[in-house]
Swiss-Prot record:
Its EC number is 1.1.1.37. Belongs to the LDH/MDH superfamily. MDH type 3 family. Catalyzes the reversible oxidation of malate to oxaloacetate. NAD(+) binds at residues 10-15, 34, 96, 119-121. Substrate binds at residues 83, 89, 121, 152. NCBIfam families: MalateDH_bact, PRK06223.1. InterPro entries: L-lactate/malate_DH (IPR001557), Lactate/malate_DH_C (IPR022383), Lactate/malate_DH_N (IPR001236), Lactate_DH/Glyco_Ohase_4_C (IPR015955), Malate_DH_type3 (IPR011275), NAD(P)-bd_dom_sf (IPR036291). GO terms for biological process: lactate metabolic process; tricarboxylic acid cycle. The lineage of its organism: Bacteria, Pseudomonadati, Pseudomonadota, Alphaproteobacteria, Hyphomicrobiales. PANTHER family: L-2-HYDROXYCARBOXYLATE DEHYDROGENASE (NAD(P)(+)), L-LACTATE DEHYDROGENASE. CDD domains: LDH-like_MDH. This is Malate dehydrogenase. GO terms for molecular function: L-lactate dehydrogenase activity; L-malate dehydrogenase (NAD+) activity.
């Protein structure tokens, strides 16, 4: 059986980490694409030279032409400008929208059957634009947000409770930005909901509120520490988990930015929701009950994403 083909559009810090993880997990052969000559070729060769040490078989190809992604099973898009200190994800809008237009055209021409995962920020608006520019069906184009945001929430909770991250489940809905909605009621430690753990005296509501805010600020915290770039290890690991669920038809329940068609009262927009990811892409969108406060937060998050999409249309009217 032929190996799967994974195309990575953008060979920066996330792109290189994606390639390494795809190799380590033997998900398939990898094509690294970038407009910077030498960068994808150099990273590809470097990772390939690690394969005898780590014991994995995969071919790594660096390219500066979209033709190299032809027939890819999965395309992961990281191309664009990363955040710098003081920048919000939204500041990147104008620059990265132009990048999505070029990437969408490349995918449409060379990999129209692929499952596409977008990581470029501002995430919810960029994946929405990418789906329109590429013309791919919405269930085959998703944004990586919720897996990362939930992972941050889970890690902070595991630290607070001094338990294994494996025993913590966490739920984050909404846009990938300051308005994201971490849901304490649906988050658990070994099946015990967080509100119950507060009642049991494991933590206080004040501490939990601070963890929720730290989750919202998770990306900015790393940008502030690194000073010259943004997070790349956890975002890459999150996208690989999504790609693996698709390639292996695992049907994982993963929070991703998916196009909604009436669920949660939202239409024709990409927002972070729990989904089932399998061989057909987004196979199910899970619509959970939200209480009044959660719904208000979610609606605020949706309004924020809608504003970004409107701004995109202002820059590129063809998106309307």
């Amino acid at each position: 059986m032929a190996r799967n083909k994974i195309a990575l559009i953008g060979s920066g810090m996330i792109g290189g980490t994606l390639a390494h993880l795809a190799g380590l997990k033997e998900l398939g052969d990898v094509v690294l694409f970038d407009i910077a000559e030498g960068t994808p070729q150099g990273k590809g060769l470097d990772i390939a030279e690690s394969s005898p040490v780590d014991g994995f078989d995969a071919k790594f190809t660096g390219a500066n032409d979209y033709a190299a992604i032809e027939g890819a099973d999965v395309v992961i898009v990281t191309a664009g400008v990363p955040r710098k200190p003081g920048m919000s994800r939204d500041d990147l809008l104008g620059i990265n929208l132009k990048v999505m237009e070029q990437v969408g055209a490349g995918i449409k021409k060379y990999a129209p059957e692929a499952f596409v995962i977008c990581i470029t920020n501002p995430l919810d608006a960029m994946v929405w634009a990418l789906q329109k520019f590429s013309g791919l069906p919405a269930h085959k184009v998703v944004g990586m947000a919720g897996v990362l945001d939930s992972a941050r929430f889970r890690y902070f909770l595991s630290e607070e409770f001094n338990v294994s991250v494996e025993d913590v489940t966490a739920f984050v809905l909404g846009g990938h930005g300051d308005s994201m909605v971490p849901l304490a009621r649906y988050s658990t430690v070994a099946g015990i909901p967080l509100p119950d753990l507060v009642k049991m005296g494991w933590t206080s509501q004040d501490k939990l509120d601070k963890i929720i805010q730290r989750t919202r600020d998770g990306g900015a915290e790393i940008v502030g520490l690194l000073k010259t770039g943004s997070a790349f290890y956890a975002p890459a690991a999150s996208a690989i988990q999504m790609a693996e669920s698709y390639l292996k038809d695992k049907k994982r329940v993963l929070p991703v930015a998916a196009q909604l068609s009436g669920q949660y009262g939202v239409k024709d927009m990409y927002v972070g929701v729990p989904t089932v990811i399998g061989a057909n892409g987004v196979e199910r969108i899970i619509e959970i009950d939200l209480d009044k406060d959660e719904k208000a937060q979610f609606d605020k998050s949706v309004a924020s994403v809608a504003g970004l999409c409107e701004a995109c249309i202002g820059i590129a009217p063809s998106l309307k």
